[in-house]
């Protein structure tokens, strides 16, 4: 049950913490599912998010199985380190490079004919979304308070 998202919010949703997104190639009718999990570390007994985000990909529609570790992304630079199982020039490398381009300039998604969807769960905490406004944004009402101010600023420009 995928719900469409505005591609301008892609970087914010990608780095939200527990994101599951689908990128669909409208021209070819193909898709790839993305699962992004923030690396956390324990500081003084409390789990704190780090700058690293692990990207898993799945091209199958088989629920929670079939995820393959693709890369580690770094939020500040939007650079990535490709997973050890993948080589330069491989299909996954091309996908990860496209994601990097989309993180730096979200308009690339629309220009390349890619549509962005989420699975009905909050991209920050992973809980199911029920409120219509939350479903439209991909972030729950409590989690939106934790998003950076730029998320709200970008939303205003997108909605207006």
Each predicted region: which residue ranges?
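General detector of N-terminal leader/presequence modules that precede the first folded domain
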Residues: 1-51
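Interaction interfaces in information-processing and related assembly proteins
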Residues: 31-95
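Short, surface-exposed polybasic-aromatic patches that bind anionic ligands, especially phosphate groups
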Residues: 85-94, 104-114, 157
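Short, flexible, mixed-charge glycine/proline-rich loop motifs
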Residues: 108-119, 130-134
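Short cysteine-rich clusters marking metal-coordination/redox-active sites
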Residues: 122-125
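Short Cys/His-rich "knuckle" micro-motifs
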Residues: 130-136, 150-153
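Cysteine-rich micro-motifs
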Residues: 135-146
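Short metal-binding segments enriched for Cys and/or His
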Residues: 147-159
